[in-house]
A protein has these predicted regions:
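An acidic- and aromatic-residue-enriched active-site/binding cleft used to recognize and process polar
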Residues: 1, 11-16, 131-133, 161-164
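Catalytic active-site module of serine/aspartate enzymes centered on a nucleophile-bearing elbow/loop
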Residues: 150-189
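Alpha/beta-hydrolase-fold enzymes
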Residues: 2-93
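Short, conserved loop/helix-junction motifs that constitute active-site signature segments
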Residues: 119-123, 149-152
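Active-site nucleophile elbow and catalytic-triad environment of alpha/beta-hydrolase enzymes
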Residues: 102-118
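Short beta-strand/loop motif that positions the catalytic acidic residue
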Residues: 122, 128-130, 134
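Conserved alpha/beta-hydrolase "acid-adjacent" motif
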Residues: 135-144
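Flexible, glycine/threonine-enriched loop-and-boundary segments that flank and lead into catalytic domains
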Residues: 111, 141-142, 184
């Protein structure tokens, strides 16, 4: 079983139970259905002219900006036009490589997704890391999740990092929890 072969688990910005609703899935579908070339999701070969590519780029720019990347760039790149160019470049790269149908399919998979009943199957020690400014995964879920895992016999720890960078904070500010990660990994054979 894969969980018996893992040395450690370090989820960042994750949850054990998703609260996705069918309306969220439909909102994504509706957003893309407004593109003239969507064709019920059969947009392939018509991404640019059909508006799907531009919609994906716009959605990704919004996501990157709201996930803390925009704040990080504002702190590290003085020129607003350059910040916009960087975000747009990342969004365009993503839009070329990602399938728009996957956006709602991933959300749909989250409906009723609850790993709580399987939590006791986790054999590897787990360090759950969340950012105090995350607008996607509420940091208040961190300790209760770890408490639940511990009640199922999982060797689990929670670590909250203080960062300005929201959902992307654990990656951007990895140095803030590097010592915690090192200590966690050092105690595991």
């Amino acid at each position: 079983h894969p969980s018996e072969r893992m040395r450690a688990l370090v989820p960042i910005a994750g949850v054990i139970k998703r609260a996705t609703k069918p309306e969220q899935v439909q909102a994504i579908i509706d957003r893309y259905a407004a593109c003239p070339g969507w064709n019920g999701g059969h947009y392939y070969g018509n991404e640019i002219d059909g508006g799907v590519f531009d919609r994906m780029v716009a959605d990704r720019i919004e996501r990157l900006t709201n996930y803390g990347i925009g704040t990080h760039l504002a702190d590290t790149v003085s020129d607003p036009a350059e910040r916009e160019r960087i975000i747009r470049g990342r969004a365009e790269t993503w839009a070329r490589e990602f399938d728009a149908n996957s956006l709602y399919i991933l959300y749909r998979a989250g409906i009723g997704s609850d790993m709580t009943p399987l939590a006791g199957n986790i054999k590897a020690p787990l360090l759950n890391v969340l950012a105090d400014t995350d607008s996607v995964v509420d940091v208040a879920l961190g300790q209760p999740t770890v408490d639940l895992l511990k009640s199922k016999g999982v060797d689990a720890e929670f670590h909250e990092i203080k960062t300005r960078y929201g959902h992307a904070g654990p990656m951007i500010d990895a140095d803030l929890w590097a010592d915690k990660l090192r200590a966690f990994l050092d105690r595991i054979p």
